[in-house]
Amino acid sequence: MVNSLKKQTFTEMRPGVKVPAKETILTPRFYTTDFDEMAKMDISVNEDELMAILEEFRADYNRHHFVRNEEFAQSWDHIDGETRRLFVEFLERSCTAEFSGFLLYKELGRRLKNKSPILAECFTLMSRDEARHAGFLNKAMSDFNLSLDLGFLTKSRKYTFFKPKFIFYATYLSEKIGYWRYITIYRHLEAHPEDRIYPIFRFFENWCQDENRHGDFFDAIMRARPEFLNDWQAKLWCRFFLLSVFATMYLNDIQRADFYASIGLNACDYDKYVIEKTNETSGRVFPVILDVENPEFYARLEFCIKNNEKLTKIANSNNPGFVKFFQKFPLYLSNGWQFLKLYLMKPIETATMQSSVR
């Protein structure tokens, strides 16, 4: 019964191997960059801090953490129906995001090895962490009779090119928001163990410290290159990446509110807390952060959610393709307008915040 339900819900490349989720603007991205420009970067301004972080990576605090215990050795058929579908989707998205980080960091470590040895070793050790995370998540998927072909994913995904400074903005935020997502879920389930539907959540406390250390590494790199933070362009780009990361998470998670409900969380409240804490953390390095406490911020995101619900209904309708296009077009324009208005909201300058943290 479970197998037949699984086969109706998920498309498989071959038995037990799931077809990767279709790439959309909201799915985890794979990145590449200008490796030569990265290799030429002078990090001497903040080399002491980078060396301290490298020593943390070498210590490998989680070397023995990602080991499955007897709690996994049971049938998970009782997680079924929509909860099962959403949980597998959560595992897949998380695995894809971690694997994306592994590929980027591994390639950076390889390309910089003979030109920037400190950065190269940091990236190589971070790729070790990301590989562990991705492998652990993929193994968890196998408890639900599915897995991802990570080799196929490597070859089939489109890679987004970002210049190094944009890689730093994006990956810093990805790691820090990952920290706050994992630690928030962990703390909630420690307080409400009855909502822990699967043992992977017990691993999130140590796991999130990997994310935090990775974020600190990108913080240190940006401080080593003050031009990434100190001019008017940096302010505009920091706003852009903050908005992109926050909006993507919010729109994704609200669509999957039933998953968060299955572990006792309200998706809206959870996301608002994670966004607030990530925004606050980003203020320690970014020259500006978003005014996420302004009621307009979430009002416009909610408008986009309603638009996306209409887009889904149109996509699932039996109308001809050209009719769907003209039905969708004004909704895309509306979403674009909402994001433009969000981007133009007055940001919060962080100079005072950074001096107080110092």
Swiss-Prot record:
Its EC number is 1.14.13.81. This is Magnesium-protoporphyrin IX monomethyl ester [oxidative] cyclase. It is an enzyme of class 1 (oxidoreductase). Its cofactor is Fe cation. GO terms for biological process: light-independent chlorophyll biosynthetic process; photosynthesis. NCBIfam families: AcsF, PRK13654.1. It catalyses: Mg-protoporphyrin IX 13-monomethyl ester + 3 NADPH + 3 O2 + 2 H(+) = 3,8-divinyl protochlorophyllide a + 3 NADP(+) + 5 H2O. Belongs to the AcsF family. It holds the Pfam family Rubrerythrin. InterPro entries: AcsF (IPR008434), Ferritin-like_SF (IPR009078), Rr_diiron-bd_dom (IPR003251). CDD domains: ACSF (cd01047). Pathway: Porphyrin-containing compound metabolism; chlorophyll biosynthesis (light-independent). Catalyzes the formation of the isocyclic ring in chlorophyll biosynthesis. Mediates the cyclase reaction, which results in the formation of divinylprotochlorophyllide (Pchlide) characteristic of all chlorophylls from magnesium-protoporphyrin IX 13-monomethyl ester (MgPMME). HAMAP family: AcsF. Keywords: Chlorophyll biosynthesis, Iron, Metal-binding, NADP, Oxidoreductase, Photosynthesis. GO terms for molecular function: iron ion binding; magnesium-protoporphyrin IX monomethyl ester (oxidative) cyclase activity. It comes from the Bacteria.
